[in-house]
């Protein structure tokens, strides 16, 4: 059984179509989260609970929803694939997830990469423009963050790990 996870912003854009196409060869359950879903500890726990009876997940959405499914399936040892609906981040295929902790801090945590990432350019092209702007910012800041972390390690002796950048 597959869980096709989308949100109220992406279910009509692509979620329902993906679920319909997959239902031809697998038992599919559509799970729809609110459009303002954040990747935080309570939402990850809810995702694990709502998808626990499924063998794998198909996420149809942008950054927060994708990271929520990514981390939930990582913790459960299940596989997932991603249908990106906007160019809002550069981490769809990454082995890390951005999670907001209980203390309010957002951090990158080890997770696992999807088995595949699919992008329908027609869907991404009509996504709100601010999502594309966010993705550009995400892509531009990554190398700067890597250099700053490495420099702090070399100059101040703080820890450094290459893994998030691989």
Q: Residue ranges of each PLM-predicted region?
A:
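ATP/NTP phosphate-donor binding region
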Residues: 1-56
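Short beta-strand/turn micro-motifs composed of small residues
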Residues: 6, 61, 119
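A short, well-structured juxtamembrane/interface segment
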Residues: 1, 165-166
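A glycine/threonine-rich phosphate-anchoring loop and its flanking beta-alpha core
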Residues: 75-165
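Short, amphipathic alpha-helical segments
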Residues: 41, 59, 63-66, 126-134
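Alpha-helical scaffold segments in soluble metabolic enzymes
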Residues: 17, 46, 71, 135-142
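Short glycine/serine/threonine-rich phosphate/pyrophosphate-binding segments
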Residues: 11-14, 62-71, 89-93
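A short, small-residue-rich loop immediately preceding and capping a beta-strand
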Residues: 51-85
């Amino acid at each position: 059984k597959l869980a096709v996870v989308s949100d109220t912003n992406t279910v009509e854009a692509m979620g329902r179509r993906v679920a319909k196409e997959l239902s031809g060869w697998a038992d599919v359950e559509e799970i729809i989260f609110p459009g303002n879903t954040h990747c935080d500890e309570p939402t990850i726990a809810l995702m694990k609970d709502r998808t626990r009876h499924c063998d794998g997940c198909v996420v149809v959405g942008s950054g927060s929803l994708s990271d929520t499914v990514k981390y939930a399936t990582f913790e459960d040892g299940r596989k997932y694939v991603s249908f990106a609906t906007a160019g809002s981040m550069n981490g769809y295929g990454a082995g890390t997830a951005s999670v907001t902790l209980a203390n309010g801090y957002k951090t990158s945590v080890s997770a696992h990469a999807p088995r595949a990432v699919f992008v329908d350019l027609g869907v991404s092209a009509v996504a709100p423009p601010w999502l594309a702007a966010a993705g550009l910012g995400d892509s531009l800041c990554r190398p700067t963050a890597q250099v700053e972390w490495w420099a702090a390690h070399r100059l101040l002796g703080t820890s450094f790990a290459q893994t998030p950048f691989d």
